[in-house]
């Protein structure tokens, strides 16, 4: 946190690149970024404000900038007040907290604005009051901005000058998506897998004529990841086809998952139908 206080940090989501600057003046084309006020809490957590539309207009809603949150927005119903029911709503496990699972609802609102940039029909999450009763919500915080919104921008956190900069990237107009399958996949452990290679040996016979022969030998061992299902959302597609907790995931659309990263798997099940899943 002390490091963030001293140097502007740029996160380029589309290039998956983080750049640390000596000062904000060192950022090229900084004039193309929109700047917004950045409030820093005593715990060095960054906050900014957004507006959103959902039957009513909600302005200057203070949000934690949470780069560890994979959702778009978390809205705290008990802090906002008068939040209308979401569109296309369903219950889900939103994540894990110190006291266990964080449950709530996911759905759609009309739009949200990050500065002058308007995002249409963002998918959002509303945690149950019971799930966040031990969360220390203070300083008039209304929720969190997560990576499903942040990834559509290049952002700069300038703690020293208390400014948050953002500029849309090539993913800005992407349709918002969520994990359609209803599965929570985790990396469980590794296993050893061996490969075989064909090795050719040249040999001479007594008449000095060369001939060759081939043999298969085990030549390389590699650690391959094992993925399993940690949770299945109630009434989800995954549950309907019979997938269960602790099932081992073997293939996605015919492809061995031990050749994929966890990010690859999560991206796949967020955009594909559960019929591609096999256990």
Where do the PLM segments sit?
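Pepsin/retropepsin-fold aspartyl endopeptidases
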Residues: 1-279
């Amino acid at each position: 946190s002390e490091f963030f206080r001293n140097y502007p940090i740029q996160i380029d989501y589309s290039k998956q690149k983080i750049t640390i600057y000596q000062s904000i003046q060192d950022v090229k084309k900084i004039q193309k970024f929109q700047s917004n006020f950045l409030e820093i809490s005593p715990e060095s957590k960054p906050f900014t404000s957004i507006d959103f539309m959902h039957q009513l207009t909600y302005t200057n809603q203070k949000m934690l900038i949470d780069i560890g949150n994979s959702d778009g927005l978390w809205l705290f119903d008990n802090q906002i007040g008068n939040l209308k029911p979401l569109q296309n709503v369903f219950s889900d496990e939103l994540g894990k907290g110190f006291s266990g699972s964080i449950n709530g609802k996911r759905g759609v609102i009309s739009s949200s604005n990050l500065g002058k940039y308007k995002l249409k029909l963002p998918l959002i999450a509303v945690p149950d009051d019971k799930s966040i009763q031990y969360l220390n919500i203070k300083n008039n915080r209304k929720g969190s901005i997560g990576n499903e919104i942040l990834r559509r921008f290049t952002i700069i956190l300038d703690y020293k000058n208390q400014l948050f900069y953002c500029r849309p990237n090539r993913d800005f107009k992407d349709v918002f998506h969520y994990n359609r399958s209803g599965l929570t996949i985790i990396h469980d452990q590794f296993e050893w897998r061996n490969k075989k290679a064909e090795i050719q040996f040249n040999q001479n016979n007594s008449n000095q004529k060369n001939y060759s022969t081939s043999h298969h030998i085990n030549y390389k061992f590699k650690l391959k990841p094992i993925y399993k299902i940690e949770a299945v959302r109630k009434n989800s597609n995954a549950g309907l086809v019979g997938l269960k907790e602790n099932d081992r995931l073997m293939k996605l659309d015919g492809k061995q998952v031990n050749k994929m990263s966890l990010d690859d798997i999560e991206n796949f099940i967020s955009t594909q139908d559960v019929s591609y899943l096999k256990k």
